[in-house]
């Protein structure tokens, strides 16, 4: 079980809701993945927009909703969006996203820290999407964030753990859960994040744009379980020199 703030999750795979062809396909993929925490953009909560009703199928699944502030370019915009989400969904949980650059969608560290500090004081459970910066992640932890969500690679890029070495430092130093978010494009990437010691991963694009999102959701669930189990079991040390698994020295000397 994974505990974030006051909530326990039976799955360490968190999922998103964007880029799916249909809401029912999104819901089926989420169910197949076993995910119990699902993030959704606040800007998609438009009353009367029935053709993009993602809320109803998610509520039917009984998952915990994590509204995000995607689209916010400043701390002020993110705080405003957070208030809207709390009013609309009745939750104080929030994935904080502030990325002013529309091309690479890299998070703004200064505005993110500023918004996080204010939102924590207002009683929000803040999970900030941020760069793989160990210093920033520690600062976010210190201001009261319930978890940190450093990126593996730019959003939707499917590049995997480009920031692997920095993620390892963040995981080593963190006293709150570390959720690797963004850039995870294959189940093997998710497994690698868990092998590093990550507490959870968030996956959206890789599932949503696959030929079979339901099957891909299931594949990610299996990969997350495998990676986590490998981490707990203890991976063997890497080395440049060979080490025979079945030495024959005694046998050969006896001939």
UniProtKB/Swiss-Prot annotation:
Q: Which InterPro entries match?
A: Aldolase_TIM, Thiazole_synthase_ThiG, ThiG
Alphabetical keyword list: Cytoplasm, Schiff base, Thiamine biosynthesis, Transferase
Example of a GO biological process term: thiamine diphosphate biosynthetic process
**EC?**
2.8.1.10
User: Which residues take part in binding 1-deoxy-D-xylulose 5-phosphate?
Assistant: 156, 182-183, 204-205
The chemistry this enzyme catalyses reads: [ThiS sulfur-carrier protein]-C-terminal-Gly-aminoethanethioate + 2-iminoacetate + 1-deoxy-D-xylulose 5-phosphate = [ThiS sulfur-carrier protein]-C-terminal Gly-Gly + 2-[(2R,5Z)-2-carboxy-4-methylthiazol-5(2H)-ylidene]ethyl phosphate + 2 H2O + H(+)
What is the residue range of the signal peptide feature? Answer: none
Q: Where is the active site?
A: 95 (schiff-base intermediate with dxp)
Q: Where in the cell is it found?
A: Cytoplasm
The GO cellular component terms are:
cytoplasm
> What SUPFAM superfamilies would the database entry show?
ThiG-like
Q: Which GO terms describe its molecular function?
A: thiazole synthase activity
Main localization category: cytoplasm
Source species, domain of life: Bacteria
Q: Does the keyword Protease apply?
A: no
What this protein is reported to do is described as:
Catalyzes the rearrangement of 1-deoxy-D-xylulose 5-phosphate (DXP) to produce the thiazole phosphate moiety of thiamine. Sulfur is provided by the thiocarboxylate moiety of the carrier protein ThiS. In vitro, sulfur can be provided by H(2)S.
What HAMAP family would the database entry show? ThiG
Q: What is this protein called?
A: Thiazole synthase
List the gene name: thiG
């Amino acid at each position: 079980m994974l505990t974030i703030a006051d909530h326990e999750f039976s799955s360490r795979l968190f999922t998103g809701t964007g880029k799916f062809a249909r809401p029912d396909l999104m819901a089926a993929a989420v169910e197949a993945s076993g995910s119990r925490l699902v993030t959704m953009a606040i800007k998609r909560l438009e009353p009367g927009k029935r053709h993009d009703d993602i809320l109803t199928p998610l509520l039917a699944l009984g998952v915990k909703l994590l509204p995000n502030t995607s689209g916010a370019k400043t701390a002020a915009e993110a705080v405003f969006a957070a208030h809207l989400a709390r009013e609309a969904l009745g939750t104080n949980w929030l994935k904080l996203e502030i990325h002013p650059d529309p091309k690479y969608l890299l998070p703004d560290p200064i505005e993110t820290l500023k918004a996080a500090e204010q939102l924590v004081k207002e009683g929000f459970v803040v999970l900030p999407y941020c760069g793989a910066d160990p210093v920033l992640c520690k600062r976010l932890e210190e201001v009261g964030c319930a978890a940190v969500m450093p990126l593996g690679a730019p959003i939707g890029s499917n590049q995997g753990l480009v920031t692997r070495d920095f993620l390892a430092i963040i995981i080593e130093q963190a006293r709150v859960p570390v959720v690797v978010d963004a850039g995870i494009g294959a189940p093997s990437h998710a497994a690698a994040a868990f092998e590093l010691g990550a507490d959870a991963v968030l996956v959206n694009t890789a599932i949503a744009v696959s030929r079979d999102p339901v099957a891909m959701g299931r594949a990610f669930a299996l990969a997350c379980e495998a990676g986590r189990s490998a981490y707990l079991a203890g991976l063997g040390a890497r080395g440049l020199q060979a080490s025979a698994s079945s030495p024959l020295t005694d046998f050969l000397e006896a001939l």
